[in-house]
Amino acid sequence: MAADQTGRIYGTIGGGNLEYQAVKKAMTLAGKDAHFVEDFDLGTGENGGLGMVCGGKVKVLFYSVKSQDPKIASFLKEALKIAEEGKPYWLLLPFSKGYPKIESHLEEGRGHCRILEKYENDETQKIYAEEFNFDGKVYIFGGGHLAQELVPVLSHLGFWCMVMDDREEYTAPNLFPGVQETKTVDFTALSDILKVKKEDYLVVVTRGHRCDADVERFALRTPASYIGVVGSKRKTQYVRDKLLAEGFTNEELDRVHAPIGIDIASETPAEIAISIAAQLIQIRAEKAGLRRKK
């Protein structure tokens, strides 16, 4: 979580009184060379604490950043570049003195969050290390009402989104707050313009079953981790039967989530967007869990 001297924050360490007290502390550190760990007692007992029913103790690492420092500026540029490229990386923050670092690989320790000990300059220092994985792009086929409701939600959840439609008026970026890219395409020639990776998500919300079939035909030939198609059970079955007749197998078609989204009895575009977002959150969490078990 980042906080500035005004109390404005980005991210969270869990909310509640712990976060409130941590932000208050961080506000006093702006512009200072302050790197330290502070213990917070979450209890409600006679010996003090933050009065939180959950109880326990938490260690919070405070690391003051001066944006004018050339080394900090260089670090931030490197982090932004790696994030834009979609590469996994490790963020390393020293417990006391020193600068944050980016590492592409980390052999020491276990888990996606680690406390390491590094020997540098004749002394041993503890380092906090956290893994950041790029979890794929969301390619949305169809720029109608549903896509316009879906993109802002997914963007807020940290998903990278691209919207495609064969109608230029439905690819105007201003229709999709938070979108990274839009493109007017021919749904029958997607393989000429898209290189889908196994970590990517394909969301099919076109205007009709013919376009759905064109996109689904393309999607089934990709390694995408998720393929979802909007529509009634009758429409999705029609497209499935059509693709079976073309030679696709039931096993291949079972990759497709159709109708798309989790079942929350959604009806409006806004409600369906929430059901799709929930399903993508679930898939992303499952993928992250598998990565962390390896």
Q: Where are the predicted features?
A:
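ADP-ribose/adenylate-binding Rossmann-like module
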Residues: 164, 201, 206-207, 217-242
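Adenosine-phosphate binding glycine-rich loop
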Residues: 230-294
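Short, structured coil segments at secondary-structure junctions
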Residues: 177-179, 222-223
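Conserved SAM/SAH-binding loop
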Residues: 185-190, 210
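Short glycine/serine/threonine-rich phosphate/pyrophosphate-binding segments
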Residues: 147-150, 210-215, 236-237
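Segments forming oxygen-rich coordination pockets for charged ligands
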Residues: 1-166, 170-176, 183, 201, ...
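Active-site-proximal loop->helix
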Residues: 172-178, 240-245
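Short amphipathic alpha-helix with an adjacent loop that forms part of the alpha/beta core around
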Residues: 188-198
